[in-house]
Amino acid sequence: FSELQKHSIPRRSFIASAGCAFLLSSCSSRQGESSKNSVPIDNVRFLRAGFADGFTMPSTLVTGRPQRAPFFLYGADGLPVVNGLPLEISGELILPSGRSEKVLLSQHSEGIPTPYFLLEFEISEENTGICQLQVDSQELTQIVEFRVIAQTETDLIQVGETMRVVDTPTFTNSAGFDPLCTRYEPCSFHNISLRDALSNGRPTILLVSTPGFCQTTVCGPVLELLIELPKDPKWDVIHAEVYTEPKKIAEGTDLQKLISPVIQTYGMNFEPCFIVAGSDNRVEARLDYAF
């Protein structure tokens, strides 16, 4: 791990170069931002998408399923705002059809370094296209655009689908991963492979993340949060890394060859991702980007 620290590059640069992307700091170039009542520049705040918005990278938001879109509040200095935040932000969601609905983005901050505001929505399957989040208040006036696509346009696993069988490394079989866990002290969630977990009739939790490269202010300690949860022996909990041999990234190895099989099999172009499946292997919940 010390070698990883010496040669580390921000992890969002890694996956972006491989045709994927780490998305927590992404922001649509089509966002409209304006201050109200001549707010001093030092007091200006604006929302940034913490997800694939469809402009800077392919969207992963789909129609016909419940979706979650986290936003971060930034200041004039270009840094995320972490103090003095409102508990919620109200706005209006304009759908591709032109229909609008009132929305409330609640603040989430427990256990994470940078609070975010969560937009939860579900739109009909015919409503693919550009959505607009319009916010107009004394503190914040802004329009943020993002794309919502059809489920057939992405290979990302969806709630209700069957888990996909793929090998993940364990303490007894590294499956070519070195290290199998980039946490400073490897976590305990490598006792069973995902392939075996999906064949034993037990519910499964799969966390895809790379804790050793968490180097941005909006990167939450998602693995640590999972470690702190009470253990239930009825569940199989698996942590899967993003790269098979991250040390080789600094050596100039083709990144596509280092992307782990679980990333490819589950259609991800981001991390972290938290997936919960029942004993029937059906996906019951999926949390992306920020928890």
Label every PLM stretch briefly.
Residues 1-9, 17-23, 33:
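N-terminal secretory signal peptides
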Residues 32-200:
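Non-globular targeting/processing and membrane-anchoring segments
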Residues 28-30:
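Bacterial signal peptide processing site
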Residues 197-213:
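Short active-site neighborhood of thiol/selenol oxidoreductases, capturing the structured segment around
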Residues 217-231:
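Typically the conserved alpha-helix immediately C-terminal to a functionally engaged Cys/Sec
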Residues 244-270:
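Thioredoxin-like thiol-disulfide oxidoreductase module
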Residues 201-205, 233-236, 271:
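Loop/turn elements at helix/coil->beta-strand transitions in domains of secreted/extracellular proteins
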